[in-house]
From Swiss-Prot:
Catalytic activity annotation: 18-hydroxy-(9Z)-octadecenoate + UDP-alpha-D-glucose = (9Z)-18-hydroxyoctadec-9-enoate 18-O-beta-D-glucoside + UDP + H(+); 17-hydroxy-(9Z)-octadecenoate + UDP-alpha-D-glucose = (9Z)-17-hydroxyoctadec-9-enoate 17-O-beta-D-glucoside + UDP + H(+)
SUPFAM superfamilies cross-referenced by the UniProt entry: UDP-Glycosyltransferase/glycogen phosphorylase
Family assignment from sequence similarity: Belongs to the UDP-glycosyltransferase family.
Protein's name in the database: UDP-glucosyltransferase A1
Pfam families: EryCIII-like_C
Keywords: Glycosyltransferase, Transferase
Length: 463
């Protein structure tokens, strides 16, 4: 559809990591197809993908311009750290908080460009793009008509009863979670929280932000969680701006089948294995999965390496019943798949279940344990509770998924639930609601500035 001058403009933002920006781009693709004009702020590694969905591109600068494969350069000592909570804390401080000024500056550059139209601009960001926070806190600069935040991770907002870990509502669990809630803000993320407040003040904010993990949930005009209710633990007192929106829309893409595509179509059983794009060491999961399934009768294993040009190590022998490809269209393969073995990314779970495919999860970094616990509670997964599963663990889990119809039945229910939530429609309704209210056109705050400076001191996060 041709762009419409009657629609509000869209400014979308996301961390330059596949699991964060790709869900945003999927929705932007739908918006541009429906006649919206969109601009996207993210890292240069994703510029072509931004342009491919019909959007204009504004790059992040400086340390904010990282990607999936350069994080070890951004976070001191990261490459020598095993996946752990300590590494997550370091990632938050350096990847999300310290880069906030550069993110905010990029948003302001984009707003300045869009302001000439005189049309309302709606800001759409993902939950960990903290550069959107100062806009809700009185910082000087251009303001959008409103802010919509997208939940591309399991819910991070705290609750007296869940903490996002399980559905246990016993008195003992309640006390434990209250203590953990306090520890998250006042011990574990105390340095990141302090730096977050300091940076916001340096940028001219007139209010302090909420707790670092929760500000986006509370301050956004609309918060759209990209999952169905069944993939979250029950919660008390969710904010009034919160809504479950289902998974991101599917888009038709050109598909050129590989030479072995006939093997997929003729196989009695197809198992897909991938490790995504972020935490990638193929000997952690892909290689043991190939080994675990090499003698399974009537089974074809398809391994997707997740990056164009990627290859398995030279010493890996690919079994006869396996096919390995660097990059592949999930939507083309998943309709033929009986089970997915992967490392627990949030988007991968949604993608798999949109095709009613149950999963085996082997992940212990980032948000992957949270994803796995939700998937297992929903009955659509087996959580191996490790990022380094043995061949035997993988084989037993795949056999259980294939041999017990309850997993496919539960996956089908979630698929139907996902289909009942049209995320693009929900987003467009939210955009139009915001644009139709009397928020005014894109304006500057009282303290007008031509350019928002990136202050040097705010970029330094002490070790």
């Amino acid at each position: 559809m041709s762009p419409s001058s009657h629609k509000p403009l869209i400014l979308a933002c996301g961390l330059p990591l596949s699991g964060h920006i790709m869900p945003v781009l999927s929705l932007v693709h739908g918006l541009t197809d429906d006649g919206y004009e969109a601009t996207v702020v993210t890292g240069r590694a994703f510029e072509q993908k931004v342009r491919d969905v019909g959007a204009d591109f504004v790059p992040l600068e400086g340390n904010a311009d990282f990607d999936d494969h350069t994080l070890d350069d951004l976070v001191p000592g990261r490459k020598d750290m095993a996946p752990s909570f300590d590494r997550t804390v370091q990632d938050v401080e350096h990847m999300m908080v310290a880069t906030l000024p550069e993110q905010f500056a990029a948003i302001q550059r984009a707003f300045k460009k869009l302001s000439a139209s005189g049309r309302p601009v709606v800001l759409v960001s993902e939950v960990l793009f903290f550069g959107a926070h100062p806009i809700s806190l009185g910082a000087p600069g251009f303001k959008p008509a409103g802010w919509i935040c997208l939940g591309v991770l399991p819910l991070l907002i705290r609750s007296d009863h869940t903490l996002g870990l399980d559905n246990d509502r016993s008195p003992e669990a309640h006390a434990k979670k209250l203590a953990m809630n306090h520890a998250l803000e006042h011990q574990i993320f105390v340095k990141a929280t302090a730096k977050h407040k300091e940076i916001c003040r340096e940028l001219g904010c007139t209010e302090d932000p909420k707790f670092i993990w929760e500000h986006s949930y509370i301050a956004a005009d609309k918060f759209l969680q990209l999952c169905p209710p069944s993939l979250e633990f029950s919660r008390d007192h969710l904010p009034s701006n919160f809504k479950f929106a289902g998974s991101t829309p599917k888009h038709r893409t050109q598909f050129t089948p590989p030479s072995w595509w006939g093997d997929v179509l003729s196989a009695k059983r197809v198992i897909m294995v991938t490790q995504g794009t972020f935490a990638v060491s193929y000997k952690h999961l892909i290689v043991p999965t190939l080994e675990a399934l090499k003698d399974e009768p009537d089974t074809l294993t398809v391994a997707i390496l997740g990056r164009r040009g990627a290859k398995l190590p030279d010493d890996v022998v690919v079994p006869e019943n396996a096919r390995v490809i660097d990059y592949f269209n999930y939507d083309a393969l998943l309709p033929h798949v009986d089970a997915l073995v992967y490392n627990g990314g949030y988007g991968g779970l949604q993608h798999s279940l949109s095709h009613s495919v149950p999963v085996v999860i082997a992940g212990d970094s980032e948000d992957k344990p949270m994803v796995a616990s939700r998937a297992e509670a929903a009955g659509v997964a087996i959580d191996l509770k490790t990022g380094l599963p043995t061949v035997e663990q993988i084989k037993e889990a795949v056999d259980s998924i294939i041999g017990n119809p309850k997993f496919h039945e539960a996956s089908k229910k979630v698929q139907m639930e996902l289909e009942s939530h049209n995320s693009l429609k929900i987003l467009e309704e939210s955009i139009e609601e915001i644009a139709s209210h009397d928020f005014g056109l894109l304006t500057k705050s009282d303290e007008e500035t031509e350019d928002i400076p990136v202050k040097g001191p705010a970029l330094a996060v002490s070790s």
